[in-house]
């Protein structure tokens, strides 16, 4: 997975947010984080043909934040927080609020930015 996919998803999240499509913004924001985490894992030599969401989250947290200390543990936490919001956005009857979408987009931007820095420094 190349970081380009994460960049594209982040752009889509920003566009959706601008259009007031908060559920879609959160969903695309989460996927930008998921794709960036996948790119980080691959850059660290942990490539798989396919990742489950739980497997990717656990490996990112355990391997890249706890064991190797390549990234802040806050990034692993934020990945989980935004995934929970994505579940609301994609699967529940309730909608994501503008405030929630704002926070999720900020977390997605920071996550992708930190992963880009980590990959380019690694």
Regions found by a protein language model. Give the residues of each.
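Terminal alpha-helical segments
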Residues: 1-122
């Amino acid at each position: 997975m190349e970081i380009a996919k994460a960049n594209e998803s982040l752009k889509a999240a920003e566009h959706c947010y601008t259009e007031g499509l908060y559920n879609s913004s959160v969903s695309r924001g989460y996927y930008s984080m998921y794709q960036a985490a996948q790119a980080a894992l691959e850059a660290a030599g942990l490539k798989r043909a396919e990742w489950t969401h739980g497997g990717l989250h656990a490996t990112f947290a355990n391997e890249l934040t706890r064991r190797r200390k390549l990234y802040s543990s806050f990034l692993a936490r934020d990945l989980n927080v935004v995934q929970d919001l994505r579940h609301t956005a994609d699967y529940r009857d309730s909608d994501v609020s503008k405030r929630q979408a704002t926070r999720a987009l900020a977390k997605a931007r920071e996550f992708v930015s930190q992963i880009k820095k980590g990959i380019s420094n690694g």
